[in-house]
Amino acid sequence: MLDIKRIRTDFEAVAEKLATRGVDAAVLNEMKEIDAKRRNILVKVETLKAERNTVSAEIAQAKRNKENTDDKIAAMQNLSAEVKALDAELAEIDAKLTEFTTTLPNIPADSVPVGTDEDDNVEVRRWGTPREFDFEPKAHWDLGEDLGILDWERGGKVTGARFLFYKGLGARLERAIYNFMLDEHGKEGYTEVITPYIVNHDSMFGTGQYPKFKEDTFELSDTNFVLIPTAEVPLTNYYRDEILDGKDLPIYFTAMSPSFRSEAGSAGRDTRGLIRLHQFHKVEMVKFAKPEESYEELEKMTANAENILQKLNLPYRVVALSTGDMGFSTAKTYDLEVWIPAQNNYREISSCSNTEDFQARRAQIRYRDEADGKVKLLHTLNGSGLAVGRTVAAILENYQNEDGSVTIPEALRPYMGGAEVIKP
């Protein structure tokens, strides 16, 4: 959530920044007018309350003097009625301002490339060289079916489209991947957490999914509960409405969880395979940091995600998202895109973001600065470390052999019970 004071005092700069995110200037101008009206009403209310206090004192004095107070009582009643009417108007204005501030996206950092969509993203670096096959590489969905480790047909029968069963070494591979990821993040100082997989609406508001993106979630009917779209939600809300000790920052959390997404805006995209599912496992990283340290922490988090891909020897690239492609809550995002041979393309496998104080303001996560003792909003960061299903897809395709088998990456073999190859 944006700081209304910043919008008020630095309106032109904020409007210019948000315009790069597709926010119409008319929206901000309307917000500015409503805010000005609110401040004018506040002045009127304070003036009327002061007058009312004066009249009240005069009534008390008149009663002590045994004078008639009818006119003064009538005047005070009129003043009270005016205050009540203005308070009601203020409540309506505050609701409108809240609607504005909770639905406007975050202000992009100065280092974010300006653009309208993913075509304007900027590649930062690449790692690894895509493998050259001397045979036609198969898509991971065909490999998974041929190996008998991924079953979309029965997933569709039991549930519906974009669901599947992992079987045998496929299930073992999925488990090996997320255990490996959690172990690697643990080495980097992350505290492993098992979170609830259901959260309440306040938690969804805190991280920015609600109210703007309700259609993308799975709500439990007639309850205050939602299936988590990512472990970012429970991990970030862990400290909602709390004041942390500044000396304890930064704090690192990691968690593996299922993620549930309706993919309401993705009809027709990636209808086959593991790239876009309604339910998938993901290892998440979340950080709580002081504002002056958060961008250094973003670089470290991105490196933590890269470490996984490097140890799995999967070629990838790092991309800085443009203002038009960033998520709602983020001030800056790096995407990690892994090479998918059958698509001859890099596909997103991780997003690492600094939301600055956007989520912290919504969730009221603060810290007491040990230097001056003041309570301040901290910065929150989140990143995929990594999306597990997409990692399975990348391994199947990059490690496939001409006979249809798939070699298991060396880093995962200690987690695979001695298996080195998945064979038909």
Swiss-Prot record:
UniProt GO BP: selenocysteine biosynthetic process; seryl-tRNA aminoacylation
EC class: ligase
Annotated binding of ATP, by residue: 261-263, 348-351
Binding residue positions for L-serine: 230-232, 284, 384
PROSITE patterns registered for this protein in UniProt: AA_TRNA_LIGASE_II
GO cellular component: cytoplasm
Record keywords, A-Z: Aminoacyl-tRNA synthetase, ATP-binding, Cytoplasm, Ligase, Nucleotide-binding, Protein biosynthesis
Gene Ontology MF terms in the entry: ATP binding; catalytic activity, acting on a protein; serine-tRNA ligase activity; transferase activity
Localization of this protein: Cytoplasm
Coiled coil: none
Listed transmembrane segments: none
Lineage top rank: taxon: Bacteria
Catalytic activity, EC: 6.1.1.11
Alphabetized InterPro entries for the sequence: aa-tRNA-synt_IIb, aa-tRNA-synth_II, aa-tRNA-synth_II/BPL/LPL, Ser-tRNA-ligase_type_1, Ser-tRNA-synth_1_N, SerRS_1_N_sf, SerRS_core, tRNA-bd_arm
UniProt-listed CDD domains: SerRS_core (cd00770)
Pathway where this protein functions: Aminoacyl-tRNA biosynthesis; selenocysteinyl-tRNA(Sec) biosynthesis; L-seryl-tRNA(Sec) from L-serine and tRNA(Sec): step 1/1
Catalysed transformations (reactions): tRNA(Ser) + L-serine + ATP = L-seryl-tRNA(Ser) + AMP + diphosphate + H(+); tRNA(Sec) + L-serine + ATP = L-seryl-tRNA(Sec) + AMP + diphosphate + H(+)
Family per similarity comment: Belongs to the class-II aminoacyl-tRNA synthetase family. Type-1 seryl-tRNA synthetase subfamily.
Assembly behavior: Homodimer. The tRNA molecule binds across the dimer.
Domain characteristics, as noted in the entry: Consists of two distinct domains, a catalytic core and a N-terminal extension that is involved in tRNA binding.
Function text: Catalyzes the attachment of serine to tRNA(Ser). Is also able to aminoacylate tRNA(Sec) with serine, to form the misacylated tRNA L-seryl-tRNA(Sec), which will be further converted into selenocysteinyl-tRNA(Sec).
Protein name: Serine--tRNA ligase
Gene behind the chain: serS
